[in-house]
Each structure stands twice: as C-alpha cells, then as structure tokens.
C-alpha cells in the first residue's frame, strides 16, 4: 500500500495486513480524496505514532462529514488538533485514557476514538457511542491484535490501553 503496509490475500474473504513497515504519519491528499473515510487513519496513526495528518475525506457525495466529535475524542485523549487548508492534523506527546461522552452518536468518531484509545495509557470510557455491527467487528479485530476492549455493541465502550499490539 502507499503507506507501506504489505497486504496479502489469504482467501476470498480473508486478508493478512502487515503494518510493521509503516513509518509515515501523513496520508497524501491524493489517497485521502479517493476514500470516503480517510479520517480513520487519524486514530490509527495517532495511537501508533503520536501524530497524523490526513486530508479531509472524499470519495462520494453522501454529504458533509463533520469531524468535530472525532477531534473532541482526540483532544480528550491529550492530542492537539488543527484543520487548515483541507488538512486535519493531530499530535500528542502522550495519549492518556479519558472519559468521553459523544454529543451525537457517530460511527466514525466511535471507531476513530477506539483506534487511538487502544494505545493510550490507562482506561478510556466512551459513552453515547455507535452500536453498529462494524463497531463490534472493529472491537473484535482490535482484541485479536492484543487490545483490551469491552462493551462494543452497547452505548458504553471501555478500553484499557496497551503498550503494543500485533
């Protein structure tokens, strides 16, 4: 992939993704504009590297994609954020678990907060979260990778940060 991940198809419905070679925290404008949800890179890269830069999402005409709840979660975890010239930037010297209540239910903000919080120190409690099946799928995937996530599928998700994942 453009970021440096190795992707291998194991079967028709199973892929193996090796991210050990990723060392980049910026997702290019070109790549971001091809995806409807490029902002998911923010939580994953912030959690892993402490910073991320991603262009505003593109990819389809479903309407505006507000990111205020995403940024609220990142800020609560200890990150600084800025949005300038169509680029979203987040940076943290140290991610710390937090209690986050989302003002509105958002699948994207829920998943992005989960992606960052799994690497934060301490416990994160996410309230008023999305309950969609893909939120549960992400929680299950993160657990298989070594994360400590409970409550996906309910309106409260509890995450205890880990030092590393596989």
Please give the residue ranges for each predicted region.
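Structural preference for solvent-exposed beta-strand-turn elements
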Residues: 1-166
């Amino acid at each position: 992939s453009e970021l440096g991940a190795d992707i291998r198809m194991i079967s028709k419905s199973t892929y193996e993704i090796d991210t050990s070679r990723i060392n980049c925290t910026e997702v290019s404008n070109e790549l971001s504009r091809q995806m409807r949800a490029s902002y998911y890179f923010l939580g994953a890269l912030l959690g892993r590297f402490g910073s991320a830069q991603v262009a505003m999402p593109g990819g389809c005409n479903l309407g505006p994609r507000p990111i205020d709840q995403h940024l609220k979660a990142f800020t609560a975890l200890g990150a600084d954020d800025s949005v300038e010239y169509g680029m979203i930037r987040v940076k943290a010297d140290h991610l710390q678990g937090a209690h986050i209540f989302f003002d509105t239910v958002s699948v994207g903000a829920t998943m992005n907060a989960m992606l960052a919080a799994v690497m934060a120190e301490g416990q994160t409690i996410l309230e008023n979260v999305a309950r969609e099946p893909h939120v549960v799928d992400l929680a299950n995937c993160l657990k298989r990778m070594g994360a400590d996530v409970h409550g996906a599928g309910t309106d409260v998700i509890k995450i205890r940060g880990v030092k590393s994942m596989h």
